[in-house]
Regions:
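Soluble accessory domains appended to multi-pass membrane transport proteins
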Residues: 1-80
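Long, non-transmembrane cytosolic or organellar matrix-exposed soluble domains/tails
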Residues: 65, 69-70, 77-176
Length: 176
């Protein structure tokens, strides 16, 4: 298929495939933009024993150390009563999981560190809290790209339980 473009004095013909395919071929990577849906009731503040457990995860141990120091300084400065976890600032399992995802993607040899990489929380829906992964693969070939995307999400789906989070699932129970 071709498309005709009128350019001032003459008409040019272009193959549609060449207009569509060129951007991907000339880019530095293929975009991965996909979400995990987290069950809202599984999100919670982290207790000190849970924080200590997560410090053993290499990718996030430095983050947890610096964040705990920052939070403790804030809570001390404002004389926050921490006998109630709800008071003051705290780490959440979902917040730490988002950092884990970003660090995992940064460390992955097949993601392109020169392009945008982020993990963000989108607006909650009736199907849960979307945690969106936005990054680029180094390899643009479709089957390799799909394999990489699957490998990343296999890992993340397996990692959810270590943060005491649950993925949203529609109930199979149907009552009349």
């Amino acid at each position: 298929m071709t498309i005709q473009l009128l350019q001032y004095q003459h008409i040019s013909l272009y193959l549609i495939h060449s207009l569509i395919g060129r951007g991907m071929e000339e880019s530095k990577g293929r975009r991965i933009k996909r979400s995990l849906l987290i069950k809202p009731s599984s999100v919670k503040f982290l207790e000190s024993n849970e924080i200590e457990k997560l410090k053993r995860v290499n990718l996030i141990s430095d983050y947890i150390d610096s964040r705990v120091t920052e939070i403790n300084e804030y809570n001390k400065k404002y004389d926050i009563d921490k006998s109630m976890l709800l008071n003051g600032r705290n780490l959440t399992n979902l917040g730490v999981f988002r950092i884990y995802i970003e660090e995992y993607l940064k460390a992955h040899p097949m993601t392109n560190e020169d392009l945008t990489l982020m993990c963000r929380q989108l607006e909650p829906t009736s199907q849960g809290i979307p945690i969106q992964i936005y990054t680029f693969s180094k390899d643009k070939e479709w089957t390799k790209y799909e394999g990489l995307t699957s490998d990343i999400f296999d890992h993340l789906l397996s990692s959810v339980k270590y943060f005491d989070l649950e993925c949203f699932e529609l109930s199979q129970n149907i009552s009349n």
